[in-house]
Amino acid sequence: MNFGSLFDNTPGGGSTGARLLSGLSYGNHTAATNVLPGGAMAQAAAAASLFSPPLTKSVYASSGLSLALEQPERGTNRGEASMRNNNNVGGGGDTFDGSVNRRSREEEHESRSGSDNVEGISGEDQDAADKPPRKKRYHRHTPQQIQELESMFKECPHPDEKQRLELSKRLCLETRQVKFWFQNRRTQMKTQLERHENALLRQENDKLRAENMSIREAMRNPICTNCGGPAMLGDVSLEEHHLRIENARLKDELDRVCNLTGKFLGHHHNHHYNSSLELAVGTNNNGGHFAFPPDFGGGGGCLPPQQQQSTVINGIDQKSVLLELALTAMDELVKLAQSEEPLWVKSLDGERDELNQDEYMRTFSSTKPTGLATEASRTSGMVIINSLALVETLMDSNRWTEMFPCNVARATTTDVISGGMAGTINGALQLMNAELQVLSPLVPVRNVNFLRFCKQHAEGVWAVVDVSIDPVRENSGGAPVIRRLPSGCVVQDVSNGYSKVTWVEHAEYDENQIHQLYRPLLRSGLGFGSQRWLATLQRQCECLAILISSSVTSHDNTSITPGGRKSMLKLAQRMTFNFCSGISAPSVHNWSKLTVGNVDPDVRVMTRKSVDDPGEPPGIVLSAATSVWLPAAPQRLYDFLRNERMRCEWDILSNGGPMQEMAHITKGQDQGVSLLRSNAMNANQSSMLILQETCIDASGALVVYAPVDIPAMHVVMNGGDSSYVALLPSGFAVLPDGGIDGGGSGDGDQRPVGGGSLLTVAFQILVNNLPTAKLTVESVETVNNLISCTVQKIRAALQCES
């Protein structure tokens, strides 16, 4: 390497040479004398003789750029520089620290890189090896120029050509000087960051070295933990040695699990655990921690043993990942349930709390994926059920589906990570899959894979949290994008069998796949929000409380035996469940969607084959459903549809006349199960009755009915098995409109804000009693005309024609 003018007999060269000599090690003395000129060789030998300890840095370890950019100090000659360096090396008997000088030179160079400018030289572009040696002229910028450049750098570290030109004119600099200043400034920032990271790594390395040395020392001189004396070599068992290795591996894995959890939740959490890896789920009222025992995940709890084996994903134990995710989600749910303003604000109707998204992102360091809408709500209320019974219902996928038939189309438990502790459900953690629905063909079903985790915080206080385990992916025409953020409920026992339930729902979804008619409903939280879940829970628990009571209301038919009541209610439950599954096209009955050219695009037509199902007639089943907006309140629409005397206004099964209620079972206020008969029966309908179930709550209403045979219903009302009664349900789902305005559906209707209802009409019809028969276009058109005619009759009866 040719250092050119660095060793010239100029004042600048002498000073630089002296600095270079101060960095030479004794071992490189011979090599240095071979390249120095005669005048400098003597000084090099004199300087090297003063070095007491060998230095660690050689001249050949410095880059040509850093050597070339060393600025000479004015007013000093070679002798003064040499004397100064000699004093720094050995004067006063002090020990020389090579790293201190090396660090000071680097910092000095960095401090100049932002304010000094080498004419014609770029810190990123120059190639010292290809250019002939030459003297470098330095131009120090004025403080005003430096201030302007620094201010611009804070706003834009990478200015474009136009910005550099404007800056050069304003500061009276060449554009190349401005360009090189920014290049050098970026290099300086990068170097400082790397130095900081290196310092942290060095500290960590020093800690590991010290720990390694202490462990080695302990292995050389083992001490007995019982008596404190020296232990024999065989005292440390092989099993304990493996446990120590496993403990070290788990500590490393824990850090990776925390990082992976941040990807699921969209924000990062720093958890600090003690040496025993205690996994605390929170604190109880006494301030004590509640921790999982070592046998957590053993499956010895009260849940049925299902798939217990864990798999490994990317080298990380899946059970550890899911456990960390559940703990983080539980912590967030409890905070959301307990917090008030400014995190939560009251909705316009005052029925629920709405989440302040800005405050949420600040509180939980969350990042929202671009292109996704957010729905978040919180509702509290009293429910006639104790906390443990509710938690057990939520942790059982079948009972959960039965409790929320209009919300959950299908649910399965795919893996039980923990069945609880000490024979209880406390601490149960399981992986679930569910299809969540709104009863309309215009709202896609939400297929969600999520964790469900329950924990007892205190006596009579439980919490159940759900959190998605699917990362958000870009949707390319496939399944709807949905991410269920920490959601669930906190339940607290009060008195007389009641509980106070605080329900929180938080999700992110792709709004582009939702029909314009239903977007306001979902934004308001009435579609999948907390108000709907809590209202359904309150209605179902009220029904259960009435049914298990021994008293019979005056409106009920006393001729039905207790066994007949139970059998009839079970039949109505199956009818309602099949009705809901035929609207949103989940995978419960393997519906196949049809596309017919002359059918309205807002009408969903599906078909399936019914074979060997005693609860349905065999053959080809056709389902058709559509949703419309009506300028009528949900209560008014519900009262009209469930009134048997007004049924002749819209139902073709009534033969144009009123219907008579033969039997009734009350399930709550304005809801129950009825058995209807037409007063104008013809010869073909002499053996047919109508089974109808009606229910209503704050989130919506439901009217479901199905034709049934009279002989079969006699068996049911006497306590017989209802599973052999064949029926195909039809009916209506009524939802509040969510406060939509005149442009909500795009069909030109002018509608008042919040004054209407969203009506879903659905029919299931047997078009052919042969399962192998072909479905004809005429059958599809018949069902489509039936829906259109029914909607028009309802509009006319309510005097709300469009």
Swiss-Prot record:
Record GO biological process: anthocyanin accumulation in tissues in response to UV light; cuticle hydrocarbon biosynthetic process; plant-type cell wall modification; root development; root hair cell differentiation
Record-linked InterPro entries: GLABRA2/ANL2/PDF2/ATML1-like, HD, Homeobox_CS, Homeodomain-like_sf, START_lipid-bd_dom
Bias kind Basic and acidic residues: ranges: 103-113
Bias kind Basic residues: ranges: 133-142
Highest taxon, organism lineage: Eukaryota
Reported phenotype of the disruption mutant: Plants display a strong reduction of anthocyanin content on the adaxial side of rosette leaves, a slight reduction onf the abaxial side, and extra cells between cortical and epidermal layers in roots.
Assigned GO CC terms: nucleus
Domain START residue range list: 315-546
Coiled coil: 182-221
SMART domains according to UniProt: HOX, START
Start-end of DNA-binding region: 134-193
Localization terms from the record: Nucleus
Region spans: Disordered: 71-143
GO MF term (any one): transcription cis-regulatory region binding
The keyword Endoplasmic reticulum belongs to this UniProt entry's keyword annotation: no
Tissue: Expressed in roots, stems, leaves and floral buds.
Keyword line: Coiled coil, DNA-binding, Homeobox, Nucleus, Transcription, Transcription regulation
Gene3D superfamilies in UniProt: Homeodomain-like (1.10.10.60)
DNA-binding recorded as keyword: yes
Stated family: Belongs to the HD-ZIP homeobox family. Class IV subfamily.
Function in brief: Probable transcription factor involved in the regulation of the tissue-specific accumulation of anthocyanins and in cellular organization of the primary root.
Subunit structure: Interacts with AIL7/PLT7, ANT, BBM and AIL1.
Name of the protein: Homeobox-leucine zipper protein ANTHOCYANINLESS 2
